[in-house]
Amino acid sequence: MDIEAYFERIGYQNSRNKLDLQTLTEILQHQIRAIPFENLNIHCGESMELSLETIFDQIVRKKRGGWCLQVNHLLYWALTKMGFETTMLGGYVFNTPANKYSSGMIHLLVQVTISDRNYIVDAGFGRSLQMWEPLELVSGKDHPQVPAIFRLTEENETWYLDQIRREQYVPNQAFVNSDLLEKNKYRKIYSFTLEPRTIEDFESMNTYLQTSPASVFTSKSFCSLQTPEGVHCLVGCTLTYRRFSYKDNVDLVEFKSLKEEEIEDVLKTIFGISLEKKLVPKHGDRFFTI
């Protein structure tokens, strides 16, 4: 596995040697704008693998994306290879309908230490919940970013990531009540601890998430990619584009219903993805917002 191939995949041409916050931010932003957050393997009859070699082949060589356990594993490898001080962490995703965090550790994120300051880096949440900059681990501090304001709080050695969102304007009236729209202005995202993890700690959950009928990943096919101004999402046959802050404190959210035969071209032109097997788009009833 060649780090230069990773840099080429994300379009990164700047310093490889400066292990500072600016470099870390640039790596994160290049990755989230080049590598989609997606689960299409499941809906093509293929598995979501955790081995680094398989992930590298899928994302770097075949120019696909992946879900958090894959894209953040790749990010962890790349940052470590560059020389950053990294720690793999595990998170518990907030289930909005149930109003509680997941009992299983289903999210992978990365801690990076720079000059005795700790940061959370996460390229694997996608949609409008995706951070665009590393978050310094300071409890109660607000982090205004392009997508929203992110907030980390710590209580009894557990950290919580929340988001304060803008209003949203949906010009297509057919979608103003879409179940894909986030209804809460204050959104809990996930919790985590600073206990170091290894990729093996996620193996059972990796299997569960792609096989259980209760999993959002089996319920919906999705693909999400950040842009310099917003984020594209494809959920089932519904294509959306959210432009952040198109007006003061308002996001513009555009919806379009696709015919199934249009999806292949949309995946290529918007997300840069060419699938080897036939995708069966799915939009089940599990909670998932864009």
Curated annotation (Swiss-Prot):
Enzyme class: transferase
Residues the record lists as binding substrate: I106, H107
A single GO cellular-component term on record: cytoplasm
Annotated binding of CoA, by residue: S103, G104, Y208
Keyword vocabulary terms for this entry: Acyltransferase, Cytoplasm, Transferase
UniProt-listed Pfam families: Acetyltransf_2
InterPro entries reported for this sequence: Arylamine_N-AcTrfase (IPR001447), Arylamine_NAT_domain_sf (IPR053710), Papain-like_cys_pep_sf (IPR038765)
Positions of the catalytic residues: C68, H107, D122
Swiss-Prot/TrEMBL catalytic activity: an arylamine + acetyl-CoA = an N-acetylarylamine + CoA; an N-hydroxyarylamine + acetyl-CoA = an N-acetoxyarylamine + CoA
GO molecular function terms listed in the Swiss-Prot or TrEMBL record: arylamine N-acetyltransferase activity; N-hydroxyarylamine O-acetyltransferase activity
Enzyme Commission code: 2.3.1.5, 2.3.1.118
Chief subcellular location: cytoplasm
Location(s), subcellular: Cytoplasm
UniProt similarity note: Belongs to the arylamine N-acetyltransferase family.
Biological function: Catalyzes the N- or O-acetylation of various arylamine and heterocyclic amine substrates, and participates in the detoxification of a plethora of hydrazine and arylamine drugs.
Protein name in UniProt: Arylamine N-acetyltransferase 2
Organism of origin: Mesocricetus auratus
